[in-house]
Amino acid sequence: MPEILNHILILEKIKNLGISPGCYLWKSRKGEVLYIGKAKNLDKRVRNYLKENHPDIKTRALQKEIFDLDWIATGTEKEALILEATLIKKHNPRFNVRFKDDKKYPYICVSLSESFPMVYITRKLKDNGDRYFGPYSDVKSTRETLDIILRIFPVRKTRQVLPLPKPRRPCLNFDMGRCLGPCQGNIPVEDYKIVIDQVIQFLEGKKESLVGDLSIKMSASSNRMDFEKAARYRDMLQRIQNFREKQTVVSAEGGDEDVIGFARKKDEGQVILLEVRGGRLETKKSFPIQGVLDAEDSEILGAFFRDYYLNAALVPPLIFVPADIQEETAAVMDVLQEKTGFRPKLKSPRGGDKRSLLKIAEKNAELGLTERLLATHYRDQTASLKEIQEMFSLEHPPHIIECYDISHFQGSEPVASGVMFVEGKPFKQGYRKYNIRGYKGINDPGMIHEVISRRLQRIANEESVFPDLIVIDGGPTQLAKACEAAMEAGAERIPMIGLAKKREEIYFPGDNEPFIFDMNSSGMKLLRHLRDEAHRFGVSHHRSRRNKETMRSLIQNVPDIGLKRSKLLLRHFSGEKKIEDATKEELLAVPGIGENLAEKILKRIRKKE
């Protein structure tokens, strides 16, 4: 049994749980809320978490941290569901699937509590009779929708309590025909309400019926010789038509439906919701998610379904999802049926147009997740480069960093490697391998001098760009020789540092005393990555060169092995596979190597052993 089960506090609390529905809160030793869940039967659900060798990875990880338990009993499972969503938003537990920045999601409000309602963006929902539409995934898309509404419908834009005690002068919106002027007292409440009802129809996605309604009103106004009002309806119809022409038709039979796509990578996820209203794709909403590493797809989608639709102003009768989440959404469906008067249908289409639409949502989710991860990585790398700039007092963040490492085996076959990072990421085209020419034996400082000289000379000859920082894998002696090479090449202005492996010590030119920076800082992590990549690249090159030299020494005295066959053998066994481990069959696979020659090579290998 996990140690946590022996804790008297939890054992005693479990005895008092009872079989009522409610929410349970697992807490850490420090009182942090780790996980929040709901249950139809609290006692049964909580005991399930305390099983030894639990099959769920996420639950096993939770077991290691739980220290205390709290719970809130409710009258029904539906009440538990609503409470669960509220508690998760309040505590944001790290073991729950979490939607990023949940508080930011905006709504469009139609202030029906006022005599002359306004239409505006808000994040606060009040229980005062106002009508809310959303949530939208970001402020930009909300503003675009609001802008369309304010261009189509002549509703007021100014925030003031109406009617005013004294009519004010008409504003520019009134002069342009974009407002009916309720602040002047020019329009009765009943007539203004008709326009507000049309706004609500538009936001509900009932554009077909809205177009029909406006067409009837335009004809009626024209028949009454009320040409001003008829012109207003005509203009509204034209603007709606222009808006609809920009929308994609995805369903010939019309209808309202939501299509949910989902993508995940490691601990991050992305949900895309496509809103189809009247058969037209109206809105794409994007919701980033965290904490999905050990969660099943059904759990993640179930959590999204709960958090989104419990707060959604409009719920369509049909919702397409990429996985079966009937069980995870049963309680939510009960609440929605009570709230809307109908139970939405969940479907996971396997073919046809609906499957194609679901694939579009999933593809958008993948693209959105990739874009977000890249943006996060770019922000992290930018922060790392900024930190390195501050660490070494550079003029600007080091956009190009190069690192050099020496590899040899007791001085034999010495090679050097140079790797390049651009904007904090490996730039493979800038990687370089060097066979040391001027030194034999163990002389790392001299070899560094040679490599830096060759590199800087090549940059000068090619009129290429100098790096913003050079990192030498080594201590003060290697760094001093690198600086000497830079001085000789007239490139002494290039900043250089040494990074020693033992304690991740940083050396500056002319200073034998190391500096120790925070090992866990983003700047040091990037420098270690750079140094380790240079070491990996160098070791790989050195191993390859040693293998070739070993093969040369093995085959150079074999009779009948000329230059051409030697090259073929070297090329064939140039990787991890060494010639001394070769079988006769493997030797025969080399072009130009027959039975007799293979036997001679094997005899030479055995003689060496």
From Swiss-Prot:
Residues 19-97 form the GIY-YIG domain. One of its GO terms (molecular function) is excinuclease ABC activity. GO terms for biological process: nucleotide-excision repair; SOS response. One of its GO terms (cellular component) is cytoplasm. It holds the Pfam family HHH_5. Keywords: Cytoplasm, DNA damage, DNA excision, DNA repair, Excision nuclease, SOS response. SUPFAM superfamilies: C-terminal UvrC-binding domain of UvrB, GIY-YIG endonuclease, RuvA domain 2-like. InterPro entries: GIY-YIG_endonuc (IPR000305), GIY-YIG_endonuc_sf (IPR035901), GIY-YIG_UvrC_Cho (IPR047296), Hlx-hairpin-Hlx_DNA-bd_motif (IPR003583), RuvA_2-like (IPR010994), UVR_dom (IPR001943), UVR_dom_sf (IPR036876), UvrABC_protein_C (IPR050066). It comes from the Bacteria. The keyword Cell membrane does not apply. The keyword Hydrolase does not apply. It is found in: Cytoplasm. Residues 208-243 form the UVR domain. Interacts with UvrB in an incision complex. Belongs to the UvrC family. The UvrABC repair system catalyzes the recognition and processing of DNA lesions. UvrC both incises the 5' and 3' sides of the lesion. The N-terminal half is responsible for the 3' incision and the C-terminal half is responsible for the 5' incision. This is UvrABC system protein C. It comes from Leptospira borgpetersenii serovar Hardjo-bovis (strain JB197).
